[in-house]
Amino acid sequence: MLSAQLNFVVTLFGIMASAATLVAAEGNFVATTPVPAEYLVGFETIRESDSQELLRTLVEGEMQGRGTGQEGYLRAARWFATQLESYGFQPAGADGSWFQNVPFIKLATQPADCGFKVGVEEFIGGTAIGISDFAGAFEASLPVTFAVVTTNRPEIAEGTFAGRLLVIQSADRIRWDDAFIVRGKPACVLFVADDGRVRNEAVNESEKTPSSIPVAMVTTAAANALAARCGARADLFSANAPTENVLVSSSQMVQCRLKIERESVDVPNVVSWYPGTDETVRHEHVCVGAHLDHLGLQREELFPGADDNGSGSTAVLQLARAIHANPVKPRRSVLLMAFCAEERGLLGSKYYVAHPLKPVSDMICMLNIDMIGRNEESTSEPASENENTIHLVGSQDHSAAFHEMVRKANESVGFVFEYDEENRVDGRSDHASFSEKGVPVTFLFGGFNPHYHKTTDTMDGINFAKIANAARLDYLVLMMAAEQGRFALDEKK
C-alpha cells in the first residue's frame, strides 16, 4: 500500500510538473509538448514581467532611441554589457573588451543649411530634407521631374533626366546606382521616404564611396508640397508602396541645398561568450543576436524603438539569463551579440562577419530576433488576429534539419508560424550577414505594423507575452542546437 501510495505521489508530481511547463506558454499560446526536463529551470526564468522591465529601461531611460553614432546608443551598449556580465557571460572582444568597435563616418547637417524653394519663396525648410546613405553636399537650381515607380521600372531613354532634379519614390529601397536612375542621368536626386529615414545626422561605413551624383532624402509631405507647387498632383506620393509607374516633368526651377559635416567615429557591437561544457566541441558555437540600434533622435524628434528592436534586445537578454540559470549548461559555446547600425544597412553584423572574433566556420547556427514586440497589423489584417503568430524566416530555406529543430522546440511554446514575409524581409535583418557565409539561420519576426519607424513605437501596445515566448523559443533552440551540433545545409534552389 505504501509503495502504491508512493507511486501515486510520484506520478502526480510528474503530471503537475508537465502541466507547469505547458502553463508557461498559456493564454493564446498553446504548448503541446512539455519542456524537456534538462532545460526547464532556465525556461521558467523567462517571465513577461521581466520583459516589461528590461524593455522599459531600453525605451524610457536615457538611451534616447539608441541611434547609431549617438550618445544614447553608447549608453545602451554599456548597459547591455553590464546585464550580460551579471548573467555569467564573458567579454569576447579584443583585450577583454565587451565591444567590437566598428569604424564609421558620421554625417551631420543643420536645418538652416538644407532645404529647397521655388522662385523666391523658401517654402520647405530643413526639417523636411535630410541625409541619405550616400549623401553628398550640393547647391543647385534645376527643373524637376517627379517619379513614382514600382519594382518593374518604366522604360526611359538614356539621359531622360539630364540636367534635372529627380524626386523619386519607389516600391523598393531604390539607390542612386539603380539602373533606372543611372540611365536617366539626373543632376540631383531626392528620395521620398517616411519621416524616420529623413535624418539630420547618420553614420556610414568608413570605406563607403559617396554617390557620383548629389542625393538626399525628403519627406512624403514635402515631396507632395513641391509637386503641387510645380503643377503636379498634391497627392502624387503616398505612404503606401506604389502600384503603378508615374513620371511628371515640370519646367519650374527648384533651388536645392544640402551642406554636410563629416567626422570619423567608432560605434560598438556588444560581443560576449558563454563557454561550452564539452572541451572537445566548445570551440563550436551557437550565435544569437539582435540589433540594439534604432533611429534615435532626429531633428529634435525621438524615435523610441520599443518594438524595433528593443523587443528583440530584451528577448536576447532574457535568453542569456535563462542559460546561466539552468543547471544543465550548453555543450557547445554561445556567442551572444547586440549589433549596431542594422538600421543603416546591417552594418554591425556585416562588420562582424568580415572581422570575426571567433571563426565563422565554427558557428553551427545563428538565431536572430527582430521586432517581436507587436502584433502584425495592416488594413487587411487586424492586430487581434496575430496575438500568437510570428514569422519564422530563413531556416526553411537554408536547412531542413535546422528548421525541423525549431518546429520541435516550438511545441513547448505554442507560436503559430507564418511564412508569408520571407521574400520581403529575408535580407533585411542581421541574420542575412551570416546566411551569406553559409551559416544556417533562423529569424523570428513579428511582422510590420503602423508604428514601424515612427515616433509612436513606444511601450504602448507591446505584447509582452510574445517577447517572453520568443525568448523561450530561442532558448530551447539554442540549448538543443548546442547539444546536437552541426546542421546540413540544403542545396540552393
Where are these regions (language model features)?
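Second-shell loop/turn segments in exported
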Residues: 37-45, 61-71, 146, 167-172, ...
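Soluble metallo-hydrolase cores and metallopeptidase-like ectodomains found primarily
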Residues: 34-35, 39, 125, 130-156, ...
